[in-house]
A protein has these predicted regions:
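Extreme N-terminal "head/tail" segments of very large remodeling/mechanoenzyme assemblies
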Residues: 1-134, 141
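Extended, Lys/Glu-rich alpha-helical coiled-coil stalks
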Residues: 129-169
């Protein structure tokens, strides 16, 4: 998982979740922030993240700027791909990217995140990387992730086929 200008984290690409993980740290260092981002990857449900009503909502906290991104790199038996999450029209949106994570897709040579997701798209075009259209709804995102999309272009991005994904906490 990669945070770029997200949740008070300027940049972090060293969070590996491909084995056992143990988070420790004092209060306020980001343990719950990271856990909620992981949970949101699987359930894409802002209401089921355990964020109290007194706190900033998921969208505003994790995506405060036009260049705030969370990139999930997913490794499957068919290779790696990324899921870019970002804010558009005041909601979290997604774009599936048919490539492993590469910093230069999202950050320029001056170590500044690209200002908008359209700039990311232009860079992907420059590198000849395939990517999906923007996914605007959580339902469509979950259907793609869990193999229930009716569009064959998204089959390579499914983790598994499950019609019961709504049962994920």
């Amino acid at each position: 998982i990669i945070f770029i200008n997200s949740a008070n984290i300027p940049y972090s690409d060293d969070i590996y979740l491909d084995g056992n993980v143990h988070f420790i740290g004092t209060q306020g260092v980001g343990k719950s922030t990271l856990l909620r981002a992981i949970l949101f990857f699987y359930n894409a449900d802002r209401q089921r993240l355990g964020i109290s009503v007194e706190k900033q909502n998921y969208t505003d906290y994790y995506f405060p700027y036009s260049n705030s991104y969370i990139v999930y790199e997913v490794a499957t038996e068919n290779g790696a791909f990324c899921i870019l999450s970002f804010k558009s029209m005041n909601r979290v949106c997604y774009r599936f990217i048919h490539s492993p994570y590469r910093k230069e897709f999202f950050i320029d040579e001056n170590r500044v995140a690209y200002s908008e997701s359209d700039r990311v798209r232009a860079v992907l075009d420059q590198y000849g990387i395939e990517y999906s259209r923007i996914i605007y709804t959580y339902d469509e995102y979950r259907n793609i992730l869990y193999g229930n999309s009716t569009s064959p272009e998204f089959s390579r991005y499914s983790l598994m086929e499950s019609k019961q994904y709504q049962n994920i906490p």
